[in-house]
């Protein structure tokens, strides 16, 4: 079978517009209890059934009176009120607490702080004691102009009378009609609109609806989204993971997106790569679903049948979208099956098989489609300005979504790009946002200010510590302990090697650099290179741990390797670390000590960027040995041949060390919790953890 090509590739905005033009909003609605309505979309405007409040009530603790009875009261003339009703006394009052209904004859409330009991006179005004009543506290039912005046809450020397409600009280301030009273309908009047059509119901909307006498509300039905994975190679989570078999997780991610955006996901079992079976399963899915997502098979490979199958069932609106990652996406318009639950046109989305591509297409096509079907607007995506410290190339003709981490260094919010592979779903976990590069732009220049679309709250971005330099699994342990005391913190690591990390720190591109550079001349770690590379940058140098480096080999050490010198044996395949990495510096030091030419080692130029990548290369059988930390060998069940011990230090910019999160980090480094956590992992010594090193004065 010949290879296929993208049949109808379009820019993202055109594909989205075509999709929405063919999609029909759901025309039915359903009624749900208010208590179960959170997150649902209103089908029509919602009106109040009752006024709120439905009676005239006290907005303060105090006494209810007729306002006109207080006219003339002043600091020089206290007016006396008696407990009772107009039928029994001349100036009646009753005690009221906040929320109590007023007697029919009352039209004002005097705050309890303004009410006094005892002898009254217009001459000399002896201190009058406030009667015992509930303390007058503003509970939010009154406006800001009605708050008590703290300078005149009590007369000087007056003391509350405990255990007594006085039958006769005095006031020295005149009330206005309906002062400190919540009138009927103050919040909302029966028949007034509460919520508009197409409104997503929030927690305080639930409260307002119930307060206004509503017990049910008409909402749009959740769009039913059939999610159909394709691929003969797919297995379910928990099944044995054999080479060539792929765990099916994309459908779970898409289902979670659908739930978050107000739909009802229906995950279907994977279908093998067979066009007839695929068409049969699609037809069945469309009988009850409002739209369908077909995962994989959307590209131009020999066994990619999604596009041809959808074309045979309807119209391909787009086959290929000018985004990266995500180009193989498909948008199709399908007629409803004969036995369908409704006769509206169905939209089918062909999702790329790579998870990052699929996630981007979900955000750019599936979310607006669900919003359209629900008759509501998409939530605004929060964007933030950031600076690109280095040039970022991009492919012309495609809108590229570059995953980035963000961190504020000084007064600049800096972005750091993550690996761009479409299959690396963990980059989405680590990403703070997307940098979207337009199709007609070939890249971002160093120093450019750009807009980043956030994937997490801005507060978490402000708590991000940018860590560059050497890789070590204990950085994850450090982050975990740090989050105990600083929950909004996050370590965003960039494993570029010790040398490159120090240089990035010097350029102001990171808060902290991890390093383990051995100086061959002095036999000391890190200090000589720090003084040589960033002499003008004020820093603090703190040891994270002393760690053990050695050769990682397969279980049982099948080649009988004993040390570095054995790497030159015939048939031994080696994996090295990148140039500038401290581990590579350590290897070169030992090779020089042994008088070994690096060219004699098969794989000396085969480079990876982390200790875990070294361990994976050995564990998978790709190579026979690599130099790395003991903890990486232990994690993957490899044998370990010790070579050396080294100081693994953290170099903090002084301005960062003096910041709140920097101080928290230093406190964690000097604490017992971190030592205990590191001690639980083989290959580390913590006697010097948290110890600060001093540079020699130049």
Model features per residue range: what roles?
Residues 2-215, 384-385, 437, 449:
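Phosphate-interaction motifs
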Residues 9, 13-16, 30-35, 39, ...:
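Flexible glycine/proline-rich
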Residues 180-294, 464-493:
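Phosphate-binding glycine-rich loops and their immediate beta-loop-alpha structural context
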Residues 406, 411, 417-509, 525-538, ...:
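N-terminal hydrophobic or amphipathic helices and topogenic motifs
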Residues 462-471, 565-590:
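Short loop->beta-strand "edge-of-pocket" segments that line small-molecule binding or catalytic clefts
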Residues 514-532, 615-644:
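A ligand-binding cleft/hinge motif common to bilobed small-molecule-binding domains
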Residues 536-548, 638-667, 691:
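Periplasmic-binding protein-like
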Residues 544, 553-574:
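Flexible hinge/capping segments at coil-to-helix
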């Amino acid at each position: 079978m010949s290879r296929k090509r993208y049949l109808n590739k379009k820019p993202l905005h055109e594909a989205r517009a075509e999709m929405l033009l063919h999609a029909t909003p759901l025309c039915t609605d359903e009624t749900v209890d208010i208590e179960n309505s959170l997150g649902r979309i209103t089908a029509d405007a919602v009106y109040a059934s009752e006024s709120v409040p439905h009676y005239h009530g006290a907005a303060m603790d105090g006494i209810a009176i007729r306002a006109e009875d207080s006219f003339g009261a002043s600091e020089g003339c206290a007016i006396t009120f008696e407990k009772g009703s107009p039928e029994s006394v001349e100036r009646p009052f009753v005690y009221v607490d906040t929320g109590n209904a007023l007697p029919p004859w009352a039209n004002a409330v005097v705050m309890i702080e303004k009410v006094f009991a005892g002898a009254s006179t217009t001459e000399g005004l002896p201190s009058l004691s406030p009667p015992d009543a509930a303390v007058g506290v503003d509970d939010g039912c009154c406006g800001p102009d009605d708050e008590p005046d703290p300078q005149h809450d009590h007369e000087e020397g007056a003391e509350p009378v405990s255990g007594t409600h006085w039958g006769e009280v005095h006031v020295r301030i005149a009330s206005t009609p309906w002062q400190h009273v919540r009138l009927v309908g103050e919040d909302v009047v029966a028949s007034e609109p509460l919520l508009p059509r197409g409104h997503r119901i929030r927690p305080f909307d639930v409260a307002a609806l119930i307060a206004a006498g509503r017990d049910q509300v008409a909402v749009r039905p959740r769009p039913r989204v059939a999610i159909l994975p394709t691929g003969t190679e797919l297995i379910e989570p928990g099944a044995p993971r054999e080479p060539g078999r792929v765990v099916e997780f994309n459908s779970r991610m898409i289902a979670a997106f659908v739930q978050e955006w107000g739909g009802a996901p229906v995950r279907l079992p994977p279908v093998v790569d067979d066009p007839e079976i695929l068409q049969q399963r699609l037809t069945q899915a469309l009988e009850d679903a409002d739209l369908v997502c077909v995962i994989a098979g959307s590209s131009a490979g020999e066994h990619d049948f999604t596009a041809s199958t959808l074309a045979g069932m309807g119209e391909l609106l787009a086959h290929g979208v000018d985004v990266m990652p995500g180009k193989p996406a498909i948008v199709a318009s399908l007629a409803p099956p004969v036995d369908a639950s409704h006769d509206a046109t169905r939209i089918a989305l062909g999702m790329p098989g790579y998870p990052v591509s699929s996630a981007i297409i979900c955000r750019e096509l599936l979310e607006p489609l669900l919003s359209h079907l629900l008759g509501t607007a998409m939530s605004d995506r929060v964007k933030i300005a950031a600076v690109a410290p280095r040039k970022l190339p991009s492919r012309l003709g495609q809108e590229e979504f570059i995953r980035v981490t963000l961190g504020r260094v000084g007064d600049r919010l800096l972005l750091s790009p993550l690996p761009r592979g479409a299959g690396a779903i963990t980059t989405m976990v680590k990403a703070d946002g997307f940098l979207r590069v337009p199709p007609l732009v070939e890249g971002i220049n160093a120093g450019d200010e750009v807009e980043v679309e956030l994937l997490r709250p801005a507060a978490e971005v402000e708590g991000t510590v940018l860590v560059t330099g050497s890789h070590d699994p204990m950085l994850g342990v450090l982050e975990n302990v740090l989050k105990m005391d600083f929950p909004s913190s996050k370590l965003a690591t960039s494993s570029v090697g010790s040398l490159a990390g120090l240089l990035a720190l010097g350029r102001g591109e990171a808060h902290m650099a991890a390093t383990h550079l051995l100086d061959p001349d002095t036999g000391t770690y890190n200090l000589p290179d720090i003084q040589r590379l960033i002499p003008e940058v004020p820093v603090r140098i703190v040891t994270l741990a002393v760690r053990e480096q050695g050769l990682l080999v397969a279980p049982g050490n099948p080649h009988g390797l004993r040390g570095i010198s054995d790497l030159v044996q015939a048939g031994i395949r080696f994996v090295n670390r990148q140039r500038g990495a401290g581990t590579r510096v350590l290897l070169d030091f030992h090779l020089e000590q042994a008088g070994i030419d690096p060219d004699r080692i098969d794989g000396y130029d085969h480079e990876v960027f982390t200790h875990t990548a070294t361990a994976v290369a050995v564990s998978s059988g790709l190579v026979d040995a690599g130099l790395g930390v003991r903890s990486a060998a232990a994690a993957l069940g490899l044998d370990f041949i010790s070579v050396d011990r080294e100081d693994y230090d953290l170099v903090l910019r002084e301005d960062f060390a003096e910041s709140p999160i920097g101080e928290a980090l230093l406190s964690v480094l000097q604490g017992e919790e971190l030592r205990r956590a590191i001690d639980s992992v083989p290959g580390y010594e913590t006697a010097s953890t948290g110890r600060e090193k001093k540079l020699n004065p130049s």
